[in-house]
Amino acid sequence: YYEEIGSTNDEAFRLGVQGAPEGTALIAESQSAGKGRLQRTWHSPPGANIYTSVILRPRFEPDLAPRISLAAGVAVAETLDPYCPGKVSLKWPNDVQIGGKKVCGILTQMKTATGVIDFVVVGIGVNVNWNLKEFPEDIQKMATSLSVEAGREVSRLELIILLYENLAKCYRELSQNGFAPLRKKWLDRTTMIGKPVSVTFGKETISGE
């Protein structure tokens, strides 16, 4: 537990390199350098949200590692469901939304050794009791918090316990039963099916549905 840290993912990665065991979890009250995908900043004010990273050491091939991020998305969605039934959805590849607005981001980082996974860090940031007026202007129209959508303040302790339980359950299911069961859960929640999408590889952009 950290009152303040640069980034829980950075610290978890450092601990992973040092040999920290699977299941090691870090949580912080605030981050001064929270990280999102594509080198974006994850806004991390103190005392309102959840910022956590978990170290996993899966026993499957590196090219299957992206499944961990999708499993984490399912775990987060199942955690938020009791607070906003029927409103939680998943947007490829790492966003959890409530009512079409982002409430959680997931960032996974992997270290490999001789063609196998050494460890994976799963970073999760959830907007919990963040007032919309406090959101940075550039994300106010696209982001929300659990308390705003639920209409009440949410116990972060209760939420983080439930999150860790669901994350452990989904990771165990992925490890023991493969991706198929989680894939169905993810597809049942995704907002992307049938929607126009564009994917950019360097200078090439591919569009489709």
Predicted regions mapped to residue ranges:
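Conserved active-site carboxylates
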Residues: 95
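Short loop/edge segments at beta-strand edges and connector loops
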Residues: 3, 90-92
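N-terminal lobe of the biotin/lipoate ligase/transferase fold
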Residues: 1-82, 102-104, 154
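Long, positively charged amphipathic alpha-helical accessory segments at protein N-termini or as interdomain linkers
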Residues: 70-88, 98-209
